[in-house]
Amino acid sequence: MCRRIVMCMGATCSTPLSTVNAYAVIKTLDEPVVRFVATDQQAEKVKAIDEPLVLNGKLDLHKAVYNHMIRHYNVGKAIALELSTFCDAPAGSGLGSSSTLVVVMIRAFAELLNLPIDDYTIAHLAHKIERVDCDLQGGRQDQYSATFGGFNFMEFYADERAVINPLRVKNWIICELEASLVLFYTGISRESAKIIADQSNNVRAGSVAAMEAMHGIKREALVMKECLLRGDFGGIVESMRQGWESKKRSAKTVSNPHLEEIYDAAISAGALAGKVSGAGGGGFMMFFVPPEKRMDVIRALKRFEGQVSNCHFTKHGTQAWRI
């Protein structure tokens, strides 16, 4: 018999997409087991409640969240439960699905254990679990995007401080963005950790091109913020172009001939700018398209293996409830 059921959902991206969601469901159990299920991956792991949960490549995110929350928030006392998750975006999509899963699992545990932890703490915990406990390389923006939701300008500091500044983007600007953005899933799964490692190694090696590229990406974030607030779509297009060129210069693995072919086809059909989401290398591509050219670009993209999606933004971050 299940005694308690907690459900949680969240969206991701720096401006989270409402069509890309991750869910976590916790059910407490009478039988002395811990069961992890990832329904989108058709994966399941069951362990006796008194057995250690070792990270071995099988549902490690689930295990790491359970271990951390039990150790630090339940005085080490194991709980018999089933933790089930699924995500609309596939792993390697570039939309931060892994980070979002960690965030929603933490939020679900916080609801289960009645923990008074705020959004900053949840995002910080998610970053620690994914980057330290699971030793997965990456940044911090995905965890904060999924936790807070909405349009934000994020500032990260060397001492692990983060400041999340909500942006009051006018509704007409959001509507125009939704009408102008086209998402295309390339079907190419990529290891973001490898690309991020390449970028980090280039910077540590003193590569001038890599350093300039990283500064360029930071600079375009500031430009994009101002353009969003003003509704300067010409500026958004140019910032998107410059940001993509800077990202490609940060590491050779960010792009490849197939992605460039897709990009060129979309531009030829009328798109004004484009980029690969996340670290790069595959996953989702995003294009800025004048609404009157939208169908032309979609037809051009459909010549490639992949999936076209619309773009809708959400104002909400993770949410949890009981039934």
Positions of the model-derived regions?
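C-terminal nucleotide
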Residues: 1-2, 6-8, 15-71, 75-77, ...
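DPxDG-like acidic metal-binding loop motif
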Residues: 95-115
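Hydrophobic alpha-helical hairpins/lids featuring a short glycine-rich hinge
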Residues: 82-89
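Glycine-rich active-site/cofactor-binding loop and its immediate structural neighborhood
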Residues: 282
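Helix-loop-helix module between adjacent transmembrane segments
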Residues: 91-93
